[in-house]
Amino acid sequence: MLTTWLTEAKKIVIFTGAGMSTESGVPDFRSSRGLWQGKNPEALASVDAMDHNREAFIDFYRMRIEGLQGVRPHKGYDVLAAWEKELPITSIITQNTDGLHEQAGSEVVLPLHGSIQRLYCVACGQRYDVARYITNEPYCSCGGFIRPAVVLFGEMLNTDTLALAERHTKEADLFLVLGSSLVVSPANLFPKIAKECGAKLVIVNHDETPLDPLADLVIQDQSIGTFLEETNRALQA
């Protein structure tokens, strides 16, 4: 069924969440064993913390950046990167900030929440490598603070990214969700929009999601990497 939809679709949108990353070893902060368990995320990853509790802010993001060192995309990422060249994928909308899609070679990534793999100075805009946090050098030569290029609590999502994601979603005839609990707004609106505009909706996630009743196909309790590899083999058969 899915292979038929993939081959017949004119425009495909992939939507990925934390479940895509966890199979590469990236912690899922929304799970019971997640990154922020026991910590208040709004006290660590917020505009307020950046402005008024900077040491804790820096320590938190240093920990996250260091935790991504050595993490590599699993084979499912490679499948998606290959599909970009073989199938009409218009975008990979992701809730993740880890940059693993780009690392695997994907070129049509729309990171809704920004990227932790980029830093920039809030004063002059100069870009920096993440090594500046690892070596504890969070200030620019101009004196400005260097921050991760992620969307913090208290900030709005990038309007250009949102607009492009919405346009591609409305144009899609197949919308494939991979590893998202679909509980975070406004990201969880995209599958609804796709369905309302006539797309086939496929949800692949370890647990149930609130949008499962809308889906044309739901797959649970399966590794996303394995699912993508098996689907790819079926496409090549």
From Swiss-Prot:
Q: Corresponding gene? A: cobB
The enzyme class is: transferase
* Disulphide linkage map: none
Q: Kindly list the cofactors needed.
A: Zn(2+)
- The record's free-text note on cofactor binding: Binds 1 zinc ion per subunit.
Q: What is this protein called?
A: NAD-dependent protein deacetylase
Give binding positions for Zn(2+).
C121, C124, C140, C142
Its lineage opens with: Bacteria, Bacillati, Bacillota, Bacilli, Bacillales
The UniProt record gives the binding positions of nicotinamide as F29, D98
GO molecular function list: histone deacetylase activity, NAD-dependent; NAD+ binding; zinc ion binding
The species this protein belongs to is Halalkalibacterium halodurans (strain ATCC BAA-125 / DSM 18197 / FERM 7344 / JCM 9153 / C-125) (Bacillus halodurans)
Which residues take part in binding NAD(+)? A18, T22, F29, R30, Q95, D98, H113, S180, S181, N205, I224
